[in-house]
Each structure stands twice: as C-alpha cells, then as structure tokens.
Amino acid sequence: METVIATTGLAMMVGLSGIGSAIGLSMAGSSVLGMIKKKPEAFGSALVLSGLPATQGLYGFVAFILYSGDVKTGITMFHAAVVFGAGLAVGLVCFISAIQQANVCSSGIQAIGGGHDAFGKTMILAAFPEFYAILSLVAAILMKGLL
C-alpha cells in the first residue's frame, strides 16, 4: 500500500505539472497566432512569452527525479506520505501557476499585437506565478530532508 501511495505522489509531480504546462502553452500559443495577424514582426517576442508556462512541467520533472529513487517496496507509511505530499504540492501548484502564467502571457501577447511595448512588463508580471512554482519545488526539496 505504501508503494502505491508514494507512486501516486510521483505521478502527481510529473502528471499535474505537465498537464498545467500543456494547457498553458496552448493558451499562450493561441494568443500568438491571433497576434501575428496584426503584427507579424513581433513573433519573436511573443514566442518567448508563449514558452514561459513550460517551466512548471520541468519543475515537476525535477521533483520526480529527486524522489523516484526513494520509492521502492518496503518503504514506511511516513516515507510514502512525504512523497505523496511533495507530489501533491508540486503537482497542484505547478498545474495552477502554469495556467495563470499563461493568462498573464496571453494578455501581454495581445497587448504587443495591439502595438504596445509590453514585452518587459509582461515578463515581470509572468514571474509572479512562476515564483510559486519555484517555491513548491523548493518545499519538495526541503521535504526530502525528512526522509
């Protein structure tokens, strides 16, 4: 049972963060496609902004790598609970922050398409939801110290 709980935690780390990144990337990418109709020369800036939600999936994968070696048969319930908790924290925070970051990036991309100089401002604002994804990864790293 403990192995199942821990493996579920691993699955949440990589699964939820990856799903959030995929949703975020498609949201921001759709905004780029709308923007290039109006201002095709701004594709490079919009491309950078549309790729930002991908990082949450990477954080989930890093957490997965950190914990995957600890999950084996015969682990304790406490050990399994730590892995599950870390998976829940990283998975959910990265899932939500990727989508919310995509909202910020999409708005910035639309502003760039409207002729506004919004690239730098959008990068700054997009860093706010990113911070919480990083914080969840740091928390998972610190939780690993409990094992």
Task: Please provide the spans of the model-predicted regions.
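Hydrophobic, small-residue-rich transmembrane alpha-helices and their short perimembrane loops
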Residues: M1-L147
